[in-house]
Amino acid sequence: MNEPLISDISRTGRKGYSLNSSDLIRTPHSQLIPGKFLRQSPAELPEVPESEVVRHFLRLSTLNYHVDKDMYPLGSCTMKYNPKINDETCSLEGFAALHPMQPESTVQGALQLMHELSGMLAEITGMASVTLQPAAGAHGELAGILLIKKYHEAQHSKRTTLLVVDSAHGTNPASAALAGYTIVSVKSNGIGRTDLNDLKEKLNGDVAALMLTNPNTIGLFEKEIVAIADMVHKNGSLLYMDGANMNALLGITRPGDMGFDVVHLNLHKTFSAPHGGGGPGSGPVGVCEKLIPHLPVPVIEKRATSEGARYHLTGDCPDSIGRMMNFHGNFAVLIRAYTYIRMLGAEGLRRVSENAIINANYLLSRLDGAYSLPYPKPVLHEFCLSGDLQKKSHGVRTLDIAKRLLDYGFHAPTIYFPLIVSEALMIEPTETESRETLDRFADAMLQIAKEAEECPETVLAAPETTPVRRLDEAMASRQLNICCR
């Protein structure tokens, strides 16, 4: 289906809605708005009747791929099914009708929810305290790195380098650079984990912290994490964990118990809020005891009064890094995460991670052999295959495999990441997929491997069933044009 732009179905004189003349403001625009802000010519808005507007956007909605339609195996993105009760709770009038500038006395329920959520996340991660302000994962990274920087400044220690493991989450180096640090990469060893010898060589008095993801983006748990923490702390550095893959650890182990000083979470991933397309997200940051004075303001405090518990926002934190954003984070995502945790409880959260690990290993067991496995199994919640076999033997790249998968009705996995895996296919099935769905996906991947061997031209020409076939993605990136005309 080739759906035209709404501007292309516009016809002069057609109307979708007419304003009643009694609703119109009688005062001339020039008296209400400064002239420099007024248009000199009419806006080129499409003239389309209501029926065509509804049909246009309904047709577009059927072209969208989302987790309510089928499995969404993007590695390191945790595209799990989002329970609809989460939407029910954040749509309650007491939450949905709030304004962030209301008096504190009128938002006690919202403050209580945030205070309790912060406490639950601290318990889940084993950290001393958690801030909910950051709006997404990379924003949480930046907050965590600024906390590290503030800590060293308070210790009168000027450290300018951050170590980042090459299997860490992709935004880590960018966040570190934004905070003004020089980034030094730490290598992985032959089994996909941090190379302790390389780490030892690169630790020195200029290193502020080591950033790593655990489990890493290959889906492997850093078994030497206690030794890593010991090495880092003996150097006077801090240990930062990117919690992008926390879906593998719930109720099983905690970052704080491993020795991490800072961890950020992705509530929209691990704790189930719809995400993709740029948001919305939430990236809370948990810290150890010595970093609490530097947390962003305002901080929510619970105080006992004659009327019972009351919640207050306080900015009386002289050593804080300050605000990370206006108001207090993406509140609707916080409500969804709170609901998710309360519905599942401690036992349910552990089952989430156990099932995510089982699903990933089952799927890997079906695909291992048809595709190259760069590092040994077992894995945790996700795994990384390589399309090297198909590329070298049949000229079929990972990109071609991903495009062909669209013809089988599935969203493609994450491709070409992590960078330490050639022709990478990173797959995360999550805990919410049934065995039947996993088998359908595995069957499609196995059929594509067979096609690559027997009729590679079919894979090279894919996709064939999608409304739009292959886009020139390189040109789109280099010659950005978002204008419809």
From Swiss-Prot:
<dbReference type="InterPro" id="IPR023012">
    <property type="entry name" value="GcvPB"/>
</dbReference>
<keyword id="KW-0663">Pyridoxal phosphate</keyword>
<dbReference type="GO" id="GO:0019464">
    <property type="term" value="P:glycine decarboxylation via glycine cleavage system"/>
</dbReference>
<dbReference type="GO" id="GO:0030170">
    <property type="term" value="F:pyridoxal phosphate binding"/>
</dbReference>
<dbReference type="Pfam" id="PF21478">
    <property type="entry name" value="GcvP2_C"/>
</dbReference>
<comment type="function">
    <text>The glycine cleavage system catalyzes the degradation of glycine. The P protein binds the alpha-amino group of glycine through its pyridoxal phosphate cofactor; CO(2) is released and the remaining methylamine moiety is then transferred to the lipoamide cofactor of the H protein.</text>
</comment>
<dbReference type="InterPro" id="IPR020581">
    <property type="entry name" value="GDC_P"/>
</dbReference>
<dbReference type="InterPro" id="IPR015424">
    <property type="entry name" value="PyrdxlP-dep_Trfase"/>
</dbReference>
<comment type="subunit">
    <text>The glycine cleavage system is composed of four proteins: P, T, L and H. In this organism, the P 'protein' is a heterodimer of two subunits.</text>
</comment>
<dbReference type="Pfam" id="PF02347">
    <property type="entry name" value="GDC-P"/>
</dbReference>
<dbReference type="GO" id="GO:0004375">
    <property type="term" value="F:glycine dehydrogenase (decarboxylating) activity"/>
</dbReference>
<dbReference type="InterPro" id="IPR049316">
    <property type="entry name" value="GDC-P_C"/>
</dbReference>
<dbReference type="InterPro" id="IPR049315">
    <property type="entry name" value="GDC-P_N"/>
</dbReference>
<dbReference type="GO" id="GO:0005960">
    <property type="term" value="C:glycine cleavage complex"/>
</dbReference>
<dbReference type="InterPro" id="IPR015421">
    <property type="entry name" value="PyrdxlP-dep_Trfase_major"/>
</dbReference>
<comment type="similarity">
    <text>Belongs to the GcvP family. C-terminal subunit subfamily.</text>
</comment>
<feature type="modified residue" description="N6-(pyridoxal phosphate)lysine">
    <location>
        <position position="269"/>
    </location>
</feature>
<keyword id="KW-0560">Oxidoreductase</keyword>
<dbReference type="GO" id="GO:0005829">
    <property type="term" value="C:cytosol"/>
</dbReference>
<dbReference type="InterPro" id="IPR015422">
    <property type="entry name" value="PyrdxlP-dep_Trfase_small"/>
</dbReference>
<protein>
    <recommendedName>
        <fullName>Probable glycine dehydrogenase (decarboxylating) subunit 2</fullName>
        <ecNumber>1.4.4.2</ecNumber>
    </recommendedName>
</protein>
<dbReference type="GO" id="GO:0016594">
    <property type="term" value="F:glycine binding"/>
</dbReference>
